[in-house]
A protein has these predicted regions:
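Formylglycine-dependent sulfatase
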Residues: 1-426
Length: 426
């Protein structure tokens, strides 16, 4: 990713519009802000009127003559017949299994799995193969298991050289083959759009041991916590324990101290990032070795950030900086003069759709019916071509929302505004 950034323009103040997976993806794939669509929680977007009546990026590109392909984790609510090829299904695993269902890994605190579920409570090397004894909750099971109901099979692991591939490895391999396939089957130079969604560092943080070995526990630097960091939040006085605070408490209790627990979790998180970084490298290598490198726009970003102990939290879906801020890198061919430059202006993920539309000169209505909404974002192309730009057509701030759960009215949700200097949380 550092290599890509050195060839690209890096947005240092880019933010998710809703910092949790499903609604974030519904938002950036349509360009419609959550406050406009009403999608800021965990419901199925395919049952939401605005979403199903607004065109997504692949739908709009397909109408404009593009072949559209995806693999891995791109949509949570994937509309039918959108892609020409859907590639590898998103599977978060492998996970421990008791013969009936996924459970927490025995090397991690049992109470975390009980309270948070097996995904968020699993962070071990792939070589730590679970062996679950029989109990009243299941007949027992030895080995890993894929987590997706569509996959629903044993994950084979004998050694690092003799095992099944993780979903992200399969997606990287799929991309390498897809580029070759396009070269062999492309008709009349038909343009293409490929969305490759890597799952890590989403939990479970299970990757090959070699990535863990790069980050020895005795060299891990954990989050430096501010004194009295919760004073400004009113959590203790007014709110029930959040999931993020619960995860932090259970991690600390499970390992006997905040420092030990956070070191172990941070090691797993860094290992997963390093693993994902290598998968990104495989995709870029395949593209750069092809004849398409010089006329393909590359956009790399994440759906949200993550708190690692800040504000006594270990999760996403809140309005603090570390959770809303995301990596955003755009590589434009023949833009060498701006390679490695950064943009400090606040932008957000709803700007992805208009940016792609601008670069690809897409035309036509972005609505399926009058019940849909047009993209709320703005093209980032002016920043890519002039990173020092001080003004643009878009807003001067990035707007993020988190559900209040007490009302469906947009004005009743929790909001954060990020400017070039400040963050205001309501």
């Amino acid at each position: 990713i550092d290599k890509l950034a050195s060839q690209s323009v890096l947005f240092n103040n880019a933010h998710s519009n809703v910092p949790v997976c499903s609604p974030s993806r519904a938002s950036f794939m349509t360009g419609v802000h959550p406050l406009s669509s009403g999608i800021w929680g965990f419901g199925n977007a395919l049952k939401q009127e605005t979403f199903i009546n607004s065109k997504s990026i692949p739908e709009y590109m397909r109408e404009n003559g593009y072949m559209v392909f995806q693999s891995g984790k791109v949509f949570h609510s994937n509309p039918k017949n959108v892609w020409d090829d859907k590639g590898v299904p998103a599977d978060y695993g492998p996970v421990a299994y008791n013969g009936k269902k996924a459970i927490g890994h025995p090397s991690n605190p049992a109470e975390m799995a009980k309270e948070l579920g097996p995904l968020d409570a699993t962070f071990v090397p792939l070589s730590d193969v679970p062996k679950i004894d029989s109990s009243s909750s299941g007949p027992g099971y030895e080995g890993w298991r894929f987590s997706n109901w569509q996959t629903n099979r044993h994950f084979n692991y004998v050694s690092e050289s003799e095992r099944d591939l993780l979903t992200d490895e399969m997606s990287a391999e799929w991309f390498e083959k897809k580029i070759d396939w396009i070269k062999q089957n492309q008709n009349n130079n038909q343009p293409f759009f490929i969305a490759t969604g890597f799952i890590r560092p989403h939990t479970p943080l299970v990757v090959p041991k070699k990535y863990y070995d790069k980050f020895p526990l005795n060299k891990i630097k954990i989050t430096e916590k501010l004194k009295d960091d919760l004073i400004d939040t009113k959590f203790r006085e007014n709110l029930k324990e959040t999931r993020g605070h619960k995860a932090w408490r259970l991690l600390s209790q499970g390992y006997g101290s905040e420092e030990k627990g956070l070191k172990i979790f941070t090691q797993a998180y860094l290992a997963s990032i390093n693993f994902a970084d290598e998968m990104v490298g495989r995709v870029l290598d395949a593209l750069d070795k092809s004849s398409y490198a010089k006329n393909t726009i590359v956009i790399l970003f994440s759906d949200h950030g993550y708190l690692l102990g800040q504000k006594d939290h270990l999760w996403k879906y809140n309005l603090w900086e570390e959770t809303t801020r995301v990596p955003l890198i755009i590589r434009q061919p023949n833009n060498d003069n701006n390679a490695g430059k950064t943009v400090a202006h606040p932008v957000s993920l709803i700007d992805i759709f208009p940016t792609i539309s601008d670069y690809c000169s897409l035309k036509g209505n972005t609505l399926k019916s009058e019940k849909g909404k047009n993209p709320n974002g703005f093209s980032l192309k002016p920043f890519v071509e002039k990173p020092e730009l001080e003004t643009w057509d878009g807003p001067e701030e990035a707007l993020t929302v988190v559900a209040s759960w007490k009302s469906k009215l947009p004005e009743k949700q929790h909001l954060a505004i990020r400017t070039d200097r400040y963050r205001y949380i309501k």
